[in-house]
Regions:
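Active-site-proximal glycine-rich helix-loop-beta segment
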Residues: 120-122, 127
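Conserved alpha/beta-domain cores
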Residues: 1-113, 119, 131-133
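Active-site loop ensemble at the mouth of alpha/beta enzyme cores that anchors a bound cofactor
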Residues: 123, 136-137
Length: 137
């Protein structure tokens, strides 16, 4: 699940996973751009939330996810991706229990995937590049 953005959501998923006797891989969604139109926890809370999620039964924290800033300035977009990578590195370096699998960086979509890859993305989301623009009817 790539869009866990709060402790409350993580706890709900964890409870259901434990009831079913499974472990669910999750990515913590971080709002690196600070844009109100985007989901995700504030970047300043990411390390604490990651460590708390890592301690939950039924979940395996596998990485972080963000959507790049919706701006034309590549420097701004890259800065958000670079910050997410640094945050991931800090989480891993902390050695906190349950964070050792926090290796994935899901960042970058069709329009900014090259920037994301340059900043260390391990997962990119390229739906528009494959399927074309969405048709809103």
């Amino acid at each position: 699940i790539e869009s866990v953005d709060s402790i409350e959501l993580a706890e709900k998923i964890a409870r259901r996973a434990v009831m079913r006797g499974i472990t669910v891989g999750v990515l913590l969604e971080v709002n690196e751009s600070g844009e109100a139109s985007k989901s995700g926890c504030p970047a300043s809370h990411a390390i604490d939330l990651a460590q708390r999620i890592g301690n939950m039964g039924g979940l395996q924290l596998q990485g972080l996810m963000t959507i790049g800033a919706h701006v034309s300035d590549e420097t701004t977009i890259r800065a958000g991706f670079a910050h997410l990578r640094k945050t991931r590195d800090q989480i891993l370096a902390s050695g906190a229990p349950g964070t050792e699998h926090c290796t994935e960086l899901s960042m970058g979509m069709t329009g900014d995937m090259e920037l994301a890859i340059a900043e260390g993305a391990t997962i990119v989301r390229v739906g528009t590049g494959i399927f074309g623009e969405r048709a809103f009817i």
